[in-house]
Amino acid sequence: MILIAHRGNIDGPIKERENTLPYIEEAHDAGYDVEIDIRLKNNKLYLGHDKAQEEVQLSWLKKRTNWLWVHCKTPETFSFFYNSQELFIHYQLNYFLHDVDQLALTSKNYIWAYPGMQPLENSIAVLPELHNEDVSKCIGVCSDYLLKYV
């Protein structure tokens, strides 16, 4: 099963550390993929769920494409990634956009399932702990509490 640290969280949310470069690296160093929130502002990329928090360079993303799940927080951000053929074709960046959609399809064709949608075969269950969901049919889990699924 693919285990994805939601904003870098592994054993419960730590809001002040979420979507920060050191926290993301710590989650990966612990052996997990990481879901990050990215937004485009003034032609620069920033980490941050509700607002632009910390600038992130494309070079940083390019070195981590095999374990990052990039949640584009705005349509403009999604369009930026979609129109960057280098990021997708050469680096195979995995990105997606969703807000309250039941499902989203990532650029690598993974089904990203909104909380409350399980059991859904071969999907990524997002925050299944919110609804005590059955993840037995999932290929992955994106959670604040990954230790529960190890």
Task: Label each PLM-derived region with a short phrase.
Residues 1-150:
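Phosphate-group recognition and catalysis centered on beta-loop-alpha active-site segments
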